[in-house]
Regions:
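Conserved catalytic/binding loops enriched for acidic/polar residues
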Residues: 183-185, 306
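Fold-core signature of tandem repeat domains
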Residues: 162, 166, 263, 267-270
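Acidic, glycine-rich two-metal-ion catalytic cores of nucleic acid-processing enzymes
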Residues: 197-215, 219, 223, 310-348
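Eukaryotic low-complexity, Ser/Thr/Pro- and acidic-rich intrinsically disordered regulatory regions
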Residues: 140, 215, 283-284, 347
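Intrinsically disordered, low-complexity segments enriched in Gly and acidic/Ser/Thr residues
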Residues: 279-305
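Non-catalytic accessory segments flanking enzymatic or RNA/DNA-binding domains
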Residues: 1-171, 176-179, 192-208, 212-220, ...
């Protein structure tokens, strides 16, 4: 995880002729590290000014830990207000709301950063065989984790269904114009190295580049995660209504009673919920892991046995440097993979 701190800046713009401040605001970040020692929000302002016919100014700056994560969550939280890239269209009330959200996320990031770092460190430490007793606080956090995880899963399922609908529509010339405004099909093709064939043909060379690696491994398992059946209406009635109404919306679109643009708006709301659930899950998970420490788990909350595992893997980078012609011989173009890209903003 990237723990780099930095600044979240709000850049506004002013019309040079009328002197009127527009409702467009760029919400971006500046990382605070050795590579960016001479960069600041003021420097970014000057860079953004190039090519912009309106005068730019810094509306506000929020300093924060986890600056990349905070910026990502902020844009997801307010996806329906985004227009393109990092730009948002905000009235005075909405601007204040986004700024307050940035400050709140920064405050929470400051509190959680130490636990997130500690949790990453603990993942690299072998555990004992001992389970420790739970506490009411940890049991409550486990519920938060389970609820957040369930929401993320449901969001993912609905978002995938939306992408399938858009993908089908983009294959229909009568619907491309409507759907192409907020969704596109992207094709990718990656080269594939046939490791097994190379190993069979050049076993001696292959053996020279097989590297043993000792790592601590152990997947955390949260109590109740496999059989979680809690109804959404019991902990988030608003989200329950969205889930319950989704099938009806899809049916109406299939019957031509609703435009597919509605689904794009729905997908933006899913991004907001995803951001909230991701943040809640991260906070609960890191706190539980830190409480678990080097123990094998917490009774009724988490099982997290970790032990050293030795694995062997091919050092492909070193092999390619030493035998580029052989690697090229066993490398071929992979299948073309199509992905549906849904606009994360409402720029129309």
């Amino acid at each position: 995880m990237n723990f780099t701190p930095g600044e979240i800046y709000f850049i506004g713009e002013k019309d040079l002729r009328t002197k009127q401040i527009t409702s467009y605001y760029k919400v971006g970040l500046v990382r605070e590290n050795a590579e960016n020692a001479d960069r600041s929000s003021t420097q970014r302002l000057l860079e953004h000014q190039t090519g912009n016919p309106r005068e730019l100014y810094i509306e506000s700056v929020v300093k924060t830990d986890l600056v990349e994560l905070v910026e990502t969550l902020l844009h997801k939280n307010f996806a329906p207000l985004g227009v393109r890239g990092e730009w948002m269209l905000l009235n005075a009330t909405q601007l204040s709301e986004v700024q307050k959200s940035a400050e709140q996320l920064a405050s929470e990031a400051k509190e959680i950063t130490a636990d997130l770092k500690k949790a990453e460190e603990l993942a690299k430490v072998a555990s004992s065989d001992e389970l420790i007793p739970s506490t009411p606080e940890l049991l409550a956090l486990n519920e938060v984790y389970l609820e957040s995880n369930a929401k993320l899963k449901a969001c993912g399922e609905m978002f995938n269904a939306i992408k399938d609908i858009f993908a089908e529509a983009l294959q229909d010339e009568d619907e491309v114009e409507e759907v192409g405004v907020f969704a596109q099909i992207q094709e990718r093709q990656r080269s594939v190295f046939d490791e097994e064939a190379f190993k069979s043909a050049h076993s001696a060379i292959y053996a020279q580049f097989v590297v043993p690696k000792a790592t601590i491994k152990g997947t955390p398992s949260f109590a109740g995660s496999k059989g979680f059946k809690k109804d959404f209406k019991d902990f988030d009635p608003g989200f329950a209504s969205m889930v319950d109404g989704f099938t009806s919306i899809v049916e109406k679109i299939g019957l031509g009673q609703e435009k597919k643009e509605y689904l794009h708006g729905f997908s933006l709301e899913l991004r907001r919920i995803n951001a909230e659930a991701t943040w809640s899950k991260m906070k609960a998970e890191s706190t539980i892991k830190v409480a678990c420490g080097t123990h094998a788990g917490i009774d009724g909350v988490i099982k997290w046995a970790r032990s050293e595992k030795v694995t062997e893997s091919l050092d492909k980078k070193a092999l390619k440097l030493s035998h580029p012609e052989l690697v090229a011989e066993f490398t071929s173009a992979g299948d073309v993979v199509k992905a549906i890209i849904v606009d994360p903003k409402k720029g129309y």
